[in-house]
A protein has these predicted regions:
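His-Asp-centered metal-binding catalytic motifs of divalent-metal-dependent phosphohydrolases/nucleases
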Residues: 1-19, 30, 53-60, 77
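Acidic/histidine metal-binding catalytic segments
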Residues: 2, 41-56, 69
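Divalent metal-dependent phosphate-bond-processing catalytic cores, especially two-metal-ion Mg2+/Mn2+ enzymes
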Residues: 6, 59-131
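Generic helix-packing signal
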Residues: 7-8, 34, 38, 80
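Amphipathic alpha-helical interaction segments
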Residues: 12-16, 41, 45, 63
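An active-site-proximal "capping" alpha-helix that borders the catalytic cofactor pocket
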Residues: 24-41
């Protein structure tokens, strides 16, 4: 759960340092930011901090996903990023086939995006316009 909360912690540093929040920069800058934050919060063992920092440093790396925590974090991040990045239907199908491994992740992906991610119900006063 802690990894889910801090996984994007490197975005602001990446934007300042590289002028970009691309995943590879988040993976570079995020772990030290996460470690610094977690050091100020009691209750985490050194092993937990190491694992959280590993996840923060790899959450945009989709090959060799090891551990259910890693898999769930990647899938949850994709569920949001598909919408934010307006991935095409083909891209969503590819991600489902190649990345999503958990039954719950696939069920959520299908429920949220179906066969066409842009046919989602959207209120008339949608803040994004043109949904």
């Amino acid at each position: 759960e802690a990894a889910a909360l801090v996984h994007d912690i490197g975005i602001h540093v990446s934007e300042k340092k590289y002028g970009s929040s691309q995943g590879r920069y988040q993976e570079i800058e995020g772990p030290s930011e996460a470690r610094s934050l977690l050091a100020r919060i009691p209750g985490f063992s050194s092993e937990e901090v190491d694992r959280i920092c590993f996840l923060v440093g790899h959450h945009h790396t989709y090959s060799d996903i090891q551990g259910m925590d890693y898999q769930i974090l990647v899938e949850a991040d994709f569920l949001v990023n598909i919408y934010e990045d307006r991935l095409s239907s083909d891209a969503v199908r590819h991600v489902r086939e190649k990345i999503f491994r958990t039954r719950t992740g696939r069920e959520l992906l299908d429920a949220m995006y179906g066969s066409n991610p842009w046919e989602m119900a959207c209120p008339d006063d949608c803040c994004h316009g043109g949904c």
